[in-house]
């Protein structure tokens, strides 16, 4: 793991939830989706039997209606926290560089809106781990 957020309490049993996310930085803007929680990177939870790359393809199609080109793995972060419904929770997030492609269908998640967020507004991302991952990606350029 490249970065761990939070502190693991050895007395607790955490529910792991792996996910995979795309980082597309183009012309000083970041590909994002906006939903009721706020701005997020395209991606989400990995389903049983699904590769990280397949997860990104599926989630991007569901959230944006667009195809993607996925590059090499960039970084990973996990977080030890208390989820308001799930209790002890450990989301494990894998980040990949890539590019959002053309729209091929309407998004199947109607509460998600695709947009390009100016990098100057990076702090608007809802998930701190995603802010860290984008900054890490920028350092690698």
Question: Where do the model's predicted regions map?
Answer:
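C-terminal lobe/hinge of AMP-binding adenylation domains
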Residues: 35-37
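Unchanged
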Residues: 46-69, 77-130
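Local beta-strand/beta-hairpin segments that build beta-sheet-rich folds
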Residues: 1, 74-75
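A short gly/proline-enriched turn/hairpin at secondary-structure junctions
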Residues: 40-44
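Acidic, metal-coordinating catalytic segment for phosphate/diphosphate chemistry
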Residues: 1-21
